[in-house]
Amino acid sequence: MSMIQNDWLDSIGEEFHKPYYKQLYDFVKEEYSQTTIYPLAENIFNAFHFTPLSKVKVLILGQDPYHNVNQAHGLSFSVLPEQKDIPPSLQNIYKELQSDLGCFIPNNGYLKKWADQGVLLLNTVLTVRAHQANSHQGRGWEQFTNAIIQAVNQQDRPIVYLLWGKPAQSKIPMLTNPKHLILKAPHPSPLSSYRGFFGSKHFSQTNEFFNANGLEPIDWQIENI
């Protein structure tokens, strides 16, 4: 697993030396040697490489990585640019963006443009076996990503959390910073999107919050490639 090299280390570097992380590292290393694991090992920490802690403006919390080929690359909800089949949840995110902000629906699901603007696309579990959803739950990633969430909570500037679905919303007790905005909605999955994800207007609300605080809004439009 590639190490984190940027300012995240100042806040969460000690996690790498804790007993749980040693067990997690050994487990994940063994899994990669025995079977197909997503994302590629060098992409596990892409969310942190692309979005340094000092640049975080939005946190979008997912669960575990996509588990089919050419999908996961370390950013929640995002897929590799060569993947032309956009996952259903991301299709629904794009539909809401179109309804909310008038964004056109792009031909890809590569969300690095968001990450580059300070949108931390974080999954609570960072690895998964091919074709086995949730197969790396309960192995230690949750403790590690809780430390990430706590580090974001400590940042003394306006930040928005987009929490879609009950697992993401279970983190709300950790979010105590009065300068931060929490937006909740059902998950964009086809199973739940019609219960209130559609029409939630989280993207325009996020930008209104930044405008009110004198900050640059997010350009949510993903371009065609």
UniProtKB/Swiss-Prot annotation:
Catalytic residues, chain numbering: 64
Superkingdom of the source species: Bacteria
Keyword DNA damage: yes
This enzyme's EC code(s): 3.2.2.27
Keyword Transport: no
Cellular localisation: Cytoplasm
One annotated Gene Ontology cellular component of this protein: cytoplasm
Known catalytic reactions: Hydrolyzes single-stranded DNA or mismatched double-stranded DNA and polynucleotides, releasing free uracil
Key words, A-Z: Cytoplasm, DNA damage, DNA repair, Hydrolase
Coarse class of the protein's main subcellular location: cytoplasm
InterPro entries: UDG_fam1, Ura-DNA_Glyclase_AS, Uracil-DNA_glycosylase-like, Uracil-DNA_glycosylase-like_sf
GO MF assignments: uracil DNA N-glycosylase activity
Family: Belongs to the uracil-DNA glycosylase (UDG) superfamily. UNG family.
NCBIfam families (alphabetical): PRK05254.1-1, PRK05254.1-2, PRK05254.1-4, PRK05254.1-5, ung
Protein's job: Excises uracil residues from the DNA which can arise as a result of misincorporation of dUMP residues by DNA polymerase or due to deamination of cytosine.
UniProt name for this protein: Uracil-DNA glycosylase
Classification of source organism: Bacteria, Bacillati, Bacillota, Clostridia, Lachnospirales
